């Protein structure tokens, strides 16, 4: 997936479509799976309800 797919431009504002990893910080996105969000760098996982 290209970086351009992580953002949505609304006029002069930018909206992030993915969450950043809370452990790794800004610039490392969480992968959006069917039942969880996962960081590929550190392995952090959040399960969806």
UniProtKB/Swiss-Prot annotation:
HAMAP family: Ribosomal_eS31 (MF_00777). A zinc finger (C4-type) spans 21-42. It comes from Methanococcoides burtonii (strain DSM 6242 / NBRC 107633 / OCM 468 / ACE-M). The gene is rps27ae. The lineage of its organism: Archaea, Methanobacteriati, Methanobacteriota, Stenosarchaea group, Methanomicrobia. This is Small ribosomal subunit protein eS31. Zn(2+) binds at residues 21, 24, 39, 42. Its cofactor is Zn(2+). Part of the 30S ribosomal subunit. The keyword Secreted does not apply. Binds 1 zinc ion per subunit. NCBIfam families: PRK00432.1. Coiled coil: none annotated. One of its GO terms (cellular component) is ribonucleoprotein complex. Keywords: Metal-binding, Ribonucleoprotein, Ribosomal protein, Zinc, Zinc-finger. It comes from the Archaea. GO terms for biological process: translation. Pfam families: Ribosomal_S27. GO terms for molecular function: structural constituent of ribosome; zinc ion binding. Transmembrane segments: none annotated. Belongs to the eukaryotic ribosomal protein eS31 family.
